[in-house]
């Protein structure tokens, strides 16, 4: 737009053309303030003239660059600029953001929302993939164990199968030999126990028939386990010898029956006591 003023006649009868002014923002701050003060005064004067000439109600608000408010109002509009409510409304309108700023803020909010939506989508995808992977692993495991569940394999067979796999396909003949040896050892143990029981009973009877003096001779239960075994063996040998020899009316002395009484497991005092005991005749006890 351009501001064109009408020409005025001169003394020579020629009209002088007025200069044209381009309407745009003034970059110079000093010139901007001067223009504001002049134009403000002129527009206030025009508003007053308009209200007087036409009898209309006029309200004019002019706000400076520094935030000062200049007003012109007819009597009916005076409460708007004089009362506190009107001033607060004017201040609220001045504090409101411009349309351009609002548009920029809305665009920025939309961009942020889009970014948030994209991040949420990216987060949901890995979370959805994890349950799918877990389900696949479970299905594969169930398929691998399906034939075991259908056949109802016992726990012992399953353990043997695992052991055979760990051994790396060992020879089945060796496994059968090992099982036979285990079975043989298990059967031989009860037989040994049955053989030992009569021997122990016989040894106890022999000891009861031949009492020993309590002085100088330790009790069999107080000796070591090795000594007890040695004595039991000696008693068994003596019993066998007695069974082999013919029975006669004359009893032989105990020195012959207990030829090995001086055991290497006894000390010197015990050996002396044994020799003294066996050298004495024991015929009166029978």
UniProtKB/Swiss-Prot annotation:
Lineage summary: Eukaryota, Fungi, Dikarya, Ascomycota, Saccharomycotina
Quaternary structure and partners: Homodimer. Binds DNA with a high specificity in complex with mating-type protein ALPHA1. Also binds DNA with a high specificity as a heterotetramer consisting of an ALPHA2 dimer and an MCM1 dimer. Interacts with YHP1 and YOX1, possibly leading to its inactivation. Interacts with ARG80 and ARG82.
Positions carrying Phosphoserine: 2, 144
InterPro entries, A to Z: MADS-box/MEF2_TF, SRF-like_MADS-box, TF_MADSbox, TF_MADSbox_sf
Residue ranges, compositional bias (Acidic residues): 97-119
UniProt cross-references to Gene3D superfamilies, sorted A to Z: Transcription factor, MADS-box (3.40.1810.10)
GO molecular function, one term: DNA-binding transcription factor activity, RNA polymerase II-specific
Keywords, sorted A to Z: Acetylation, Activator, Arginine metabolism, Cell cycle, DNA-binding, Nucleus, Phosphoprotein, Transcription, Transcription regulation
Protein name per Swiss-Prot or TrEMBL: Pheromone receptor transcription factor
PANTHER family, per database record: SERUM RESPONSE FACTOR HOMOLOG
Residue ranges annotated for the MADS-box domain, each copy included: 18-72
Biased composition (Low complexity): 122-136, 171-246
GO biological process, one term: positive regulation of arginine biosynthetic process
Coiled-coil region: none
């Amino acid at each position: 737009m351009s501001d064109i003023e009408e020409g005025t006649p001169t003394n020579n009868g020629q009209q002088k053309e007025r200069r044209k002014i381009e309407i745009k923002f003034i970059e110079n701050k000093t010139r901007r303030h001067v223009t504001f003060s002049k134009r403000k005064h002129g527009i206030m004067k025009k508003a007053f003239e308009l209200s007087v000439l036409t009898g209309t109600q006029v309200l004019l608000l002019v706000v400076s660059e520094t935030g000062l408010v200049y007003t012109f109002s007819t009597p009916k509009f005076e409460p708007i600029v004089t009362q506190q409510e009107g001033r607060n409304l004017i201040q609220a309108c001045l504090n409101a953001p411009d349309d351009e700023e609002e548009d920029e803020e809305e665009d920025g909010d939309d961009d942020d929302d889009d970014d948030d939506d994209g991040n949420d989508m990216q987060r949901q995808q890995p979370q959805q993939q994890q349950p799918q992977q877990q389900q696949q692993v479970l299905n594969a495991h169930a398929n691998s164990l399906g034939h075991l569940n259908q056949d109802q394999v016992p726990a012992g067979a399953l353990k043997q199968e695992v052991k055979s796999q760990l051994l790396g396909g060992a020879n089945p003949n060796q496994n059968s030999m090992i099982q036979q040896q285990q079975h043989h050892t298990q059967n031989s143990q009860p037989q040994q126990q049955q053989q030992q029981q009569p021997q122990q009973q016989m040894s106890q009877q022999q000891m009861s028939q031949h009492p020993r003096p309590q002085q100088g001779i330790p009790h069999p239960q107080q000796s070591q386990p090795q000594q007890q075994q040695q004595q039991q063996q000696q008693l068994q040998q003596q019993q066998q010898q007695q069974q082999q020899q013919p029975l006669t009316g004359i009893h032989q002395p105990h020195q012959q029956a207990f030829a090995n009484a001086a055991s290497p497991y006894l000390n010197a005092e015990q050996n002396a006591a044994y020799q003294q005991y066996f050298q004495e005749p024991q015929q009166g006890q029978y």
